[in-house]
Amino acid sequence: MEISARGNHVTIKGNIKSLQDYQKIKETLDNLTKSYKQITIDVLDSISMTSSVIGYLNKLVMKDGIDLKLNVGNEKLIELLEDLNLLSIFNVKRLVR
């Protein structure tokens, strides 16, 4: 997994699957939340997301008041987030390329 940030916009390439992926995502977003209350994340092609990442994103929205927008490129990940009733909480949109 690769992660990059420009301003309040984060791009994630590859599958989100390991503890190291979670740590990279958390570190990147922790730094951004010091300066921004709105963050957009493009998840280009991951087919899933670990529970630790989902829990962390939920904390950002529900506890820290971050306005999160999650743009997802893979239909399976959208279905997972829908099954977990997270589409509206994370403002999930289908990523158009």
Which residue ranges define each predicted feature?
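A short acidic, often aromatic-flanked loop/helix-cap motif at beta-alpha or helix-coil junctions
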Residues: 10-12, 78, 96-97
